[in-house]
Amino acid sequence: MCFRTAGAATGSATEREAPPSVPDKRSKLGLLMLDCLIIGGGPAGLTASIYLARYRRAAVLIDDGASRAARIPASHNYPGFKGIAGPDLLARLREQALLYGAKLEHGRVTTLQPWPQGGFRAQWNGKDIAARTVLIATGLIDESPKVEGLVSGVYDGAVRFCPICDGFEAMDRRIGVLGSTDEAGRKALFLRTYSRHVMLFGKEEMSEAMRVSLNQAGIGCAGKAIRVECPKDGVRVTVQGGDCFDLDVLYPALGCQVRSELATGLGAACTETGNVIVDAHQRTSVAYLYAAGDIVSDLHQLAVATGHAAIATTTIHNSLGRNPR
């Protein structure tokens, strides 16, 4: 039996075999067979929970509380808000999901395996759960170097991660970028869009071409940062040798780790950087396994994550067959 799945944006349709059906939604071992298990409680996962609840699907979201969005001091390009802090946005999404009866659980999924009867079986907090489909929205983790004071600076709001989200608000201010790779150089060049006063801390691993580009853009390069302090209304960076630099905002560019181990454990195809490869409907290379958000895209934007979730859950809903009231 085949069902048609909704197009990502154009209304196109793709046929794919429907997930295995269990008449009473219970497996032979007595586990509740969900329509969908959502792993990850960031913007993508919570949006998915809202959609599936409104589609009247049996779904559970399991979140370990590690959403990167919780570290955003303020995002100014999320539609509908002049500026909203990451924790506030997550709280609003949770409230909206619960309004429609969504099931939200705190915990960490440690194993995810194919289910003999079809679908998947997962373990979390010592419990078992089974689902016909799974949506992974576990995001990524930013690398944190051993720089004194850097982590506390994140919570003070002077250390930020997303220049697309708040670079505009740093217009003509003193901006620092922390990192020694070409990726850090690209972030510094992007921030040059907003200010002439951009300083890069560390360039040990940069290519010669990147060094030339930074010089042509008028971006200064200082030594390796060893300490970050956040006095009132700013940030101070101390480098090896003792020199200090007073800035208004600092952006780390130290790389990140995609949390795709659950997907790769099932054999899902990934890029060299660990991002899960999906089609236009957020389907991975593993049948009935979907992915959304930062785990998929290197454009780490809240709006992108919520869009992924809307596409994935509509495809999931259509693939499961009708659920008349």
Identify the role of each PLM range.
Residues 157-164, 174-187, 208:
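Active-site glycine-rich loop that binds ribose-phosphate moieties when present
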Residues 152-169, 254-304, 311-314, 318:
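FAD-site-proximal beta/loop scaffold in flavoenzymes
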Residues 2-8, 13-34, 91:
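Extreme N-terminal leader/targeting segments of oxidoreductases
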Residues 91-92, 97-123, 129-131, 193-275, ...:
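A Rossmann-like FAD-binding core segment of flavoenzymes
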Residues 54, 197-203, 304-325:
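Internal hydrophobic alpha-helix adjacent to the cofactor/substrate pocket in enzyme cavities
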Residues 2, 25-36, 104-173, 238, ...:
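FAD-binding core/adjacent interface of flavoenzyme oxidoreductases
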Residues 34-88, 179-205:
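Beta1-alpha1 glycine-rich phosphate/pyrophosphate-binding loop at the start
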